[in-house]
Amino acid sequence: MGVLVKNLVEDLKLEVLNKGKDDIELNISDINRPGLQFSGFYNYFANERVQLIGKTEWSFLDVMSPELRKKRVAKFFQFETPCVIITRNLKPHKEVLENSRKYNRWLLNTSNISTRFTSKLMNYLDEKLAPETRLHGVLVDVYGIGILITGESGIGKSETALELIKRGHRLVADDAVDIKEIEGKLIGSSPYVTSGMLEVRGLGIIDVPSLYGLSSVLDIKTIGVIIHLEQWKKDQDYDRLGIDEINRDILNVPVRKITLPIRPGRNIAVIIEAAAANYRYNLNSNSSPVDTIGARMKEENLKNK
């Protein structure tokens, strides 16, 4: 689903110079600067994009003769475009305003300069148009790493998150995690209704920022690791060295997945802290603890020869 232009106007606080149809949508985040079109070039025209008229395009129109400007602008507006945005609060030329009305096109204005507004608009559209999904789990920030805790209901995900919050880490989402893929990264957040809330079985729903302060919650976080909790299975062969790297694909983005078996006496919160610290260490290191042990074993073997 695309972004309605009328919502774009509201969210980015744009001035409406001419109102188009309410059902016009933006479906891509790219932007077109129509300088070539104003010069008469239409061999390729990305008319499905937002059309941005900055100082350069405005000045180009300004130096044209009235007859030529009338012809070029009329040709431009004959193409279906979602909206035309003029930056720097530049006053639209009469021909631009008249043709936007004639063809019922959205004509908007912003006080921002072109480069700043382009960045703002593309970031906005990237977020709104990003592929998204909702997963069952808990998302927390541990040592700056986004940890998505998954597992069957009642396994202890929320209780583990509560222990992590008590230890100074931050909650992003509990129970339902909204995830968007933006530029190859998975950005997790909480649905509005449950934002800042944590459900603990037997205790009920607790308001995390009210109990632990505003610093105990985050609005969004990039997901770095998935920690999957499951009941301990005696015959299951669990990874003991950390060399079996398993990934889970979310929105076609691979994420490192670590399975932690639950059994009495295991402090899952502490283990998750270690997993986050180890993940951050591996991001900046060329060797793992297993490599270090292997090197030491070689040293011992050489000594014993």
Curated annotation (Swiss-Prot):
The record, for Gene3D superfamilies, names: HprK N-terminal domain-like, P-loop containing nucleotide triphosphate hydrolases
For this protein, the record's InterPro entries field holds: HPr(Ser)_kin/Pase, Hpr_kin/Pase_C, Hpr_kin/Pase_Hpr_N, P-loop_NTPase, Ser_kin/Pase_Hpr-like_N_sf
Keyword list (alphabetical) reads: ATP-binding, Carbohydrate metabolism, Kinase, Magnesium, Metal-binding, Multifunctional enzyme, Nucleotide-binding, Serine/threonine-protein kinase, Transferase
**Does the record carry Amino-acid biosynthesis as a key word?**
no
Which biological processes are named by the entry's GO terms? regulation of carbohydrate metabolic process
Might you give the EC number(s) for this enzyme? 2.7.11.-, 2.7.4.-
Which Pfam families does the entry link to?
Answer: Hpr_kinase_C (PF07475), Hpr_kinase_N (PF02603)
Where do the segments described as Important for the catalytic mechanism of both phosphorylation and dephosphorylation lie? 198-207
Q: Which cofactor does it need?
A: Mg(2+)
Q: What class of enzyme is it?
A: transferase
Where does this protein hold ATP? G151, E152, S153, G154, I155, G156, K157, S158
Return the similarity comment: Belongs to the HPrK/P family.
Which additional comment does the entry carry?
A: Both phosphorylation and phosphorolysis are carried out by the same active site and suggest a common mechanism for both reactions.
Describe the subunit structure: Homohexamer.
Q: What is this protein called?
A: HPr kinase/phosphorylase
Q: Which organism is it from?
A: Clostridium tetani (strain Massachusetts / E88)
